[in-house]
Amino acid sequence: MFLAQEIIRKKRNGQALTAAEIQFFVNGITTNSVSEGQIAAFGMAVYFNDMNMDERIALTIGMRDSGTVLNWDSLGLNGPVIDKHSTGGVGDVISLMLGPMAAACGGYVPMISGRGLGHTGGTLDKFDAILGYQTEPSSELFRKVVKEAGVAIIGQTGDLVPADKRFYSIRDNTATVESISLITASILSKKLAAGLDALVMDVKVGSGAFMPSYAASEELARSIAAVANGAGTKTTALLTDMNQVLASCAGNAVEVVEAINFLTGEYRNPRLYEVTMGLCAEMLVLGGIAQNEIEARTKLNTVLDNGKAAEVFGKMIAGLGGPTDFIEAYDKYLPQAKIIRPVFSDAQGYAHSMDTRELGLAVVTLGGGRRKPGDKLDYSVGLTQVCALGEQISTDKPIAMIHAQTEDDFLEAELAVKNAIKIQSSMPEKMPEIYRYIRAADL
């Protein structure tokens, strides 16, 4: 029998906790036998004194097991259960293509996603833009769509990781969100509760990233890879670039359109293609669908080019209550903003740098993102045709198109976009799309 205050005292004094002590504390979070004040104190003690890898693994497993852990054995799936998670960015529409692409190659992707907050967009918000699509289906429907389509992208259900829900809301109010140990456990407890065979983690780096520096992003990526593998799930983390908008657009309905154009081959933004392929190929290798990256990329290009990935996307949309002809007639079902107008630069030269976070906040200003949880969204607004770094810019060539509902919103977003994209006479240094892979063997 342990006492919550003794566990807090031990961590306050910089000592390592045992797995049993951590399990006891997590149980207390779930059953409310540990008070809000004690959870806040524990969070602050971890923030200042950190946790070693064994502690992080114990915290992740304890939180994962605080609710239902999905099990896919009874469905008789003939492929691996695989998934991807991103730390979030601007124009990060990868999940919408990656899930169907991996499923079309023989994987099963039960993707439990979140909504956007602050400057980062949320995968669920993009699906909420689709008429009829259920982001909170029954567990029976979720399982049915995973089995039949190979992929289902939904929101977190109430019975998954209740400990994280309570802990996170307290961390949010007590300034302990930025702890790598606690971020690792929060992300992974949710992902591993989906009963995965393998996971690929996309950790963003740059001006639109969640972490403030490359070093912090790398530390988080290493922590996630070590803890997930330590908890028994094959995992690789990729560090990818978020120094500019990833797709050609940012918003909700506009990103759904870009995903469809990508899947059908209408248009594939080269940077988006590189990051999507890098993540998806790693999923196939970890899941045993491909022997190596070259074979994985060949399989992925095949399902893109023969239309199978697009077909899977359509099947998932229809299976979760959306239109049956969504791929062919998406413009009938997606909302459109009243004002769609270009924004021009006052300078000529090259797009030299981008404050990606500010561009994400411009989407929030338009009504396409949240300032606080629970805010209602306008799914039609956003940015499209955003220029890429290194692109030649003249005063008569738009740096982006703004989709707004009112003239005032347009003007506010126009100012934000102009301020966020810096034009200079010289070309910027080219950044890689993928900085590095952190695999189990690298730990």
From Swiss-Prot:
Claim: Transferase is one of the keywords in the record: yes
SUPFAM superfamilies with a match to the protein in the record: Nucleoside phosphorylase/phosphoribosyltransferase catalytic domain (SSF52418), Nucleoside phosphorylase/phosphoribosyltransferase N-terminal domain (SSF47648), Pyrimidine nucleoside phosphorylase C-terminal domain (SSF54680)
Gene Ontology biological process: pyrimidine nucleobase metabolic process; thymidine metabolic process
Matches recorded under InterPro entries: Glycosyl_Trfase_fam3, Glycosyl_Trfase_fam3_N_dom, Glycosyl_Trfase_fam3_N_dom_sf, Nuc_phospho_transferase, PYNP-like_C_sf, PYNP_C, Pyrmidine_PPas_bac/euk, Pyrmidine_PPase_CS
Pfam families reported in the protein's UniProt record: Glycos_trans_3N, Glycos_transf_3, PYNP_C
UniProt EC number: 2.4.2.4
Role: The enzymes which catalyze the reversible phosphorolysis of pyrimidine nucleosides are involved in the degradation of these compounds and in their utilization as carbon and energy sources, or in the rescue of pyrimidine bases for nucleotide synthesis.
Family label: Belongs to the thymidine/pyrimidine-nucleoside phosphorylase family.
Subunit-level organization: Homodimer.
Protein name (database record): Thymidine phosphorylase
